[in-house]
C-alpha cells in the first residue's frame, strides 16, 4: 500500500481544506484535553476537523466544531458527545499573542492537524486569513501548473 507523501507518520488527521480556504501566517503546537474514548477515536482516525476553529473564552482557548466519532457504543453508562468543546493547552503569553492577532488584526485561528508527540495528543493550529474567490482561483491554477510541470519533467527523464 502506498503511503501519502505529504503526511508525516505521526499525524492522525490533516485539515486539507485549510490550505485552500485560508492563507496561513503562523503555526503553533498546542496540547488538547481529551476524554478516554476521544483518545481512542483519535488513534483510530475517526475524527473530522475540516470545519473546526479556535475560540477564546475567559482567557482560555477552546476547540469548536470538531467531531470525534466513538469507536463503539457498547458502553451503556457513558453518553458520547461527539461535538464537545475541547480545551486547548497553551502558555499565557501565547494566548495573549493569539488574542491580539485574533481581534486587532482580524485574523482567525484554525486547526491544521492533530498528531501524537510521544504519547501526548497535540494540535497544530495556525493564524490564518480567509482567501477571496480570486485568490482561490490563482491557487488552483498554480497547483495545476505545478502538476503539469512535474509530468513533463517525468517524461523527459524517462
Curated annotation (Swiss-Prot):
A single Gene Ontology MF term assigned here is: RNA binding
Record-linked InterPro entries: SmpB, SsrA-bd_prot, SsrA-bd_prot_CS
**Location(s), subcellular:** Cytoplasm
Under the cellular component aspect of Gene Ontology, which terms does the record hold?
A: cytosol
Query: SUPFAM superfamilies from the entry?
Result: Small protein B (SmpB)
Q: Which domain of life is it from?
A: Bacteria
Q: Which Gene3D superfamilies match?
A: 2.40.280.10
Indicate whether Cytoplasm appears among the record's keywords: yes
| Keywords for this protein | Cytoplasm, RNA-binding
Give the GO terms filed under biological process for this record.
trans-translation
Mind telling me which HAMAP family this protein's record contains? SmpB
Which family does the record claim for this protein?
A: Belongs to the SmpB family.
Biological function: Required for rescue of stalled ribosomes mediated by trans-translation. Binds to transfer-messenger RNA (tmRNA), required for stable association of tmRNA with ribosomes. tmRNA and SmpB together mimic tRNA shape, replacing the anticodon stem-loop with SmpB. tmRNA is encoded by the ssrA gene; the 2 termini fold to resemble tRNA(Ala) and it encodes a 'tag peptide', a short internal open reading frame. During trans-translation Ala-aminoacylated tmRNA acts like a tRNA, entering the A-site of stalled ribosomes, displacing the stalled mRNA.
Q: Which NCBIfam families match?
A: PRK05422.1, smpB
Q: What is this protein called?
A: SsrA-binding protein
